[in-house]
């Protein structure tokens, strides 16, 4: 049979059409024996090869044969049944991938926002289970601190101010801290810290407004609020917990060593 020849399969009532070369990738599989007529369990019915197996699960098998990758839906839960189907077709590379089931499970990304409002200042500390989330927020958040650009004149007792942009502090890979509002300096001057969070171009000094913008940013990134609590009854630090389900990676075969597998990011 030519590799470019089309083959129609009826798997449990679901009809699939593909090239014979797609089904011939693994010479030791039952699909290969099905095509050359050596496996008598498969019958030709009205021009279609009838396979008395699960057609829904076969769609994932055919996708694997076409792409050399296994990418399952986030809510997929039939790993054992799919592995049983892979064993039936004697597709050992697919069986090996399914043995890495823990890599196929969706993983939650967690974020906690600690917020403390005290007098005219507000303090933020953001913890993230995924360092990439913290890196994303660090790239979007800018702290603007008032700095005198010229001394006060005799006609004006207030010095001219400019805004110095600074990134939030990163105590570790998994958290960042920043604050906003007004604070007093050693020269008895009151200076204001503003916060800007891209793509919003506003500079906000009010802690409640900054908290709202930060929450909106996380929601737009696919996180959802799962709970709130008071961390400390003494200083009234509020904690907002967020979660985002990360889609599983695609598992791909190593093309040089068929028995090995490589994690491929989802396209």
Swiss-Prot record:
Molecular function per GO: identical protein binding
Native source species: Bos taurus
Cited function: Inhibits potassium fluxes in cells. May regulate Kv1 family channel proteins by retaining a fraction of channels in endomembranes.
UniProt keywords, alphabetically: Endoplasmic reticulum
Quaternary state and interactors: Can form homooligomers. Interacts with KCNA1 (via cytoplasmic N-terminal domain) and KCNA4.
InterPro entries listed in its UniProt record: BTB/POZ_dom, SKP1/BTB/POZ_sf, T1-type_BTB
Annotated protein name in UniProt: Potassium channel regulatory protein
Domain annotation BTB: ranges: 5-74
Coiled-coil positions: none
Gene encoding the protein: KCNRG
Membrane-crossing residue ranges in chain numbering: none
PANTHER family membership: POTASSIUM CHANNEL REGULATORY PROTEIN (PTHR14499:SF5), POTASSIUM CHANNEL TETRAMERIZATION DOMAIN-CONTAINING (PTHR14499)
Primary localization: endoplasmic reticulum
Pfam family, one: BTB_2
